[in-house]
Amino acid sequence: MKRWILILAGLALALAASAQETILDRLKAANTFDTMQLSFVQTRHSALLTKDLVSEGQMVLASPDRIRWEVLKPYPSVFVSSGELTPSGRRFRMPTEKDFTATTLEGEDLTVKLVPVRRDLKSLFREIIVHADKQSLQIRSALLITPDGDWTQLEFKDFVVNRPVDAKLFEKE
């Protein structure tokens, strides 16, 4: 799950590279920030479970590599990363537009289907479908589908961009 959170933080870059050149610049501008705070609802579906798991929380991002992912309910938990090494001892590399092939889909929102190119990402995802608001171009939701068909839907709201963030939020408790 922790890798998924870090990968999500890089989705703005992948989404930005997914469309035509005029959209590309607008998406990059809309999803470039020094800090971002938002609320999320996460729905996880697994063939092994009889019922989907739904959780709610908040995420705080600060450029270039700080993230706080806090689940508030039903089971409170906090994940904090400030550019640390992965368990394998290597620095995590944020995905970029070169790590996915992208297809723009028709619909009410700007919808982009991302298919991973890197082997390590292919082991995590079959595809990622990202929805962005056509006006603001902010990412509103992401559907992450695993190779076995399980999925996680993330819905984002209450965006606050480029406001000061307390550095203590990124300290491990």
Enumerate the language-model features and the residues they cover.
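N-terminal leader/targeting segments and the immediate start of mature chains
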Residues: 15, 19-52, 171-172
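Solvent-exposed coil/turn segments that connect beta secondary-structure elements
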Residues: 41-45, 64-66, 72-75, 82-86, ...
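An acidic-aromatic
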Residues: 54-98, 152, 158
